[in-house]
Every structure is written in structure tokens, then in C-alpha cells.
Amino acid sequence: MEVKELERDKNRVVLEYVFGAEEIAQAEDKAVRYLNQRVEIPGFRKGRIPKNVLKMKLGEEFQEYTLDFLMDLIPDTLKDRKLILSPIVTERELKDVTARVVVEVHEEPEVRIGDISKIEVEKVDEEKVLEKYVERRIEDLRESHALLEPKEGPAEAGDLVRVNMEVYNEEEKKLTSREYEYVISEDEDRPFVKDLVGKKKGDVVEIEREYEGKKYTYKLEVEEVYKRTLPEIGDELAKSVNNEFETLEQLKESLKKEGKEIYDVEMKESMREQLLEKLPEIVEIEISDRTLEILVNEAINRLKREGRYEQIVSSYESEEKFREELKERILDDIKRDRVIEVLAQEKGISVNDEELEKEAEELAPFWGISPDRAKSLVKARQDLREELRWAILKRKVLDLLLQEVKVKVVEPKGEGDDSEGKEDN
């Protein structure tokens, strides 16, 4: 077998495979064995049909089977090439003692990574975030530790109302009966709850609703109305929250530590996402238009199979506009992936089995299974293992790059103009 490069356009390569007489003979023998198990020809026992008879009776069909078996030799020649698309056969022919196959392959495109330090990501001011977090948590604690005192008067803003809700269908059959507690807020507009404003203990509220063409009646009986008194912000509140706290400052420090853990996790993830979004801006890529065209067509065909294409395209000026945007998105995704791959290789970043197991354990609650089951699942499924490996690898590379980018500290939303942020390297 001879392999010749006929054409190269960036990452797209056209290869010609020429097979000799010996390889063709071996492929024909495989075709004979394959066809003898499936073809019956009068006058010959099944499985005993000679090659020359099969070639004569089947003609071009026999040649196609022979070419199929010759093509089984091609994948081994491509194993050292990293491809982003499956090989595409553009020509194949078998004549006498030579066979020729032309294959179009699309390799992973080369990238040139620019100056990472030109990328800017935003980080919300930690001190102000934690200050707001502590204030909000203290208010939550006041709400949860409110003193309740039964009252005879009507329910108003700030009160807690306990009701028994019964639901009846059109035939007046009771479907459910359950107790609920609601805290009435200022300008209350929640369904059902707003109907409790002004009601007293013993009052019954009937509300009719229609769902999917069926009518239901909701009967809410007010069992109790409580006046809520929120505790003052001070040492006594701290003591009521946890007997380990003696002062309000101790409670605030504990809440600040709690908020810091949340802040660190969420801010790191936010900065990773910002960096990932901006990576294409500093990347140049050598990729063929033909590669992008195939990827766009594959994405469109997938949307059509899922029945989502028409709906998505309808939000664009034209199908061409949609194709252009889809092409840009695909190009940016390839840039991101290639940067992660290239830098992981350059920096020696990899993912080991212990990291995969830890990731599986952390994801187990979201999957609704036990940690042991999650680890077993990852071991058993190559696709899932590769998905987790890539997620961890991407995270590691992004964390490394975050050390090089510009960081702009901005005000929390609603706290001021983000443009007045300061840089923090």
C-alpha cells in the first residue's frame, strides 16, 4: 500500500491510497468468506462458492465488497493523526491488479496563542459582597427566630398565617388537604396569599382556578394568625442562633467565613467562564473553510433531527445569517478546545484516576446515586470518563491562565458603576 498526499489546505489533507496485487488478493479472499455466508447461487453449496464464480455473478458488487475490506487497512495509517472529523472517502476504484482510494481527512488545526495578559476578567469586590452577605444572613436569622404571638385581628403585612388548604374538583370531590404557613409581605401579590390579607382566625377563603380545561376549588381555612416580632440585632440574637456564640461579632465572623467559602467558589467559576468566553480573541487558528462547512452542516442536520431547526432559524433575519453565526460559534469553540489541549500538553497538565473518582463523588448527589455507584459508572463508561476528564482538564488549564489575566474589581450589581472598577493583578 502506498500513501500519497495529494492536497493540503491548512488542516484539511487529501490522501491517495494505492493498493497492490497482494493486498487486493487478501481483500478478495475476505470478501469471498463474507459472501459465502450470505449468498446462495444455484448449483453450488452454501459456503463453497469459488471466488471466480462470485466475481462473475456479482460483478461490481464483488468489487465494492473488496474495496470495503481494503479500506479496513486505512485507519491504522491515520492513528498518529489527531482528527476532528471522521475520514471522508471521495473516490475509490478497483481495476485489475490495482485499487485506488482517495480520502479527505481533517486534522486538529494548529493554533497560535497570543498574550493572555491582554484578557480582562471582572471580580466583584469581596469586602462589599461579604458585608452584604452578612447583613442578609442576619436578616434571615431574625426572620427564622421571630417570636410568634396569636392575634385576634385581621392578618396584615408581617404576620404569619397558618391555613388548611383543601382542593376540590368539579364534582366537589376532595382531592387534597394540607397545612401551609405564609408570611405576608408588603404589597403582597402571590396567588392565594394575597387573598389572606385582612382575614381572621376561622375565616374561609374560596378560590376557583382552571388548569388544562378543568376547574378546581381551593378552600383555605385560617387556623391561626400570628403577630411576628423580630429579635433585635445584638448579642441575644447571636446566642439564640448558636450557644457557641456569646456576641454579635462572633456571629458576624462566622457568617463572614461562611460567605467567604461561597464567594471563593462562585467567583472562581465566574472568572473561569469569563476567561473561556474571551479566549478566542487572542487565538489565531489554521482551519480550512471546508472543515467549518462540514461542521456547520452536521450541526444543522442535528437540529433538524431534533425538530428545533425551524424555531431557531425563525429568530434570525435569514438562514444565511444563522449559518454565519453558527459558523462563528463553532470556530470559537474549536479555538477554546485547542487552547486547552495545547496548553495542557505544554504545561504537562493531566487528570489521574483519583481526580476522576473525586469528581464522580462530588457529582453523585446531582446524579441521584451513591458515591460508590457514581465511581463504578465512571469506570464502566468510557464516554462519561472522557467527559469528566475533559471538564477537570479544562478547569486546571483555566485556573493556570487566571494567574496571567488582568483582574478588574467591580462593585456588586446595584452598588455602582462597574466601569469604575480597579485592576487587581
Curated annotation (Swiss-Prot):
SUPFAM superfamilies: FKBP-like, Triger factor/SurA peptide-binding domain-like, Trigger factor ribosome-binding domain. It comes from the Bacteria. Keywords: Cell cycle, Cell division, Chaperone, Cytoplasm, Isomerase, Rotamase. GO terms for cellular component: cytoplasm. Belongs to the FKBP-type PPIase family. Tig subfamily. NCBIfam families: tig (TIGR00115). Consists of 3 domains; the N-terminus binds the ribosome, the middle domain has PPIase activity, while the C-terminus has intrinsic chaperone activity on its own. This is Trigger factor. It comes from Thermotoga petrophila (strain ATCC BAA-488 / DSM 13995 / JCM 10881 / RKU-1). The gene is tig.
